[in-house]
Amino acid sequence: MNISQQFAPPFKLIAPYFIIGVLTLTITTFLLFDIDISSAHSLNNSTLSWVHLFLLGFVMMIIFGAMAQLVPVVLEVGHFAVDLYYIIYPLLFVGTLLMAFGFYYYPAILPYGGVIAFIAFFVFLLETFLTIIKVKKFNFVITSVLIANIFLFFGLIVGIVLALGYSGAIDIQVYQILKAHVYLVLIGFVCITIMGMSLVLLPMFWLSHSFS
């Protein structure tokens, strides 16, 4: 793969993602001691708050930081507008905090946190799709990135609907569409992204050229 150093984002852009991610992981680890495991399956307020704080503040934050670095490697083109990543992490961080507090204390602020987080995700998706447009030749890995981000887009739409429903802004059967949100984001985006990226990254660590 012919990767130019000019495609690599500056360290000051990437660092906040990993700093926030590690801090969130530390906080959520300690918060686990306050969660009643016997009632975790019921998706009560504390469980939903912890899950979103962990998944958005740690998992997605780390993925976004990694994607800022890996997209040029996988697509073999520069970012369409890498500076957009400077506004993604503060929006995602604020949105995550509002959602966590909304689930735990005050459901009325859930839509606000959801919208702020949605804007962060939308900026990420927009930048990624515009970068993919620059690709001249598609392969399996690039296609997997495209498909994963399409799943993420629909997962976000469902997530906003769920936030509105949980806060009481609209009348929906929250638990009937909850699985769609989980499958679209965790299976559709996270798992496909990891599998697609692995086809590029594993040969690098194994010092081989490609899968046979």
Residue locations for each model-derived region?
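Hydrophobic alpha-helical transmembrane segments of multi-pass integral membrane proteins
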Residues: M1-S212
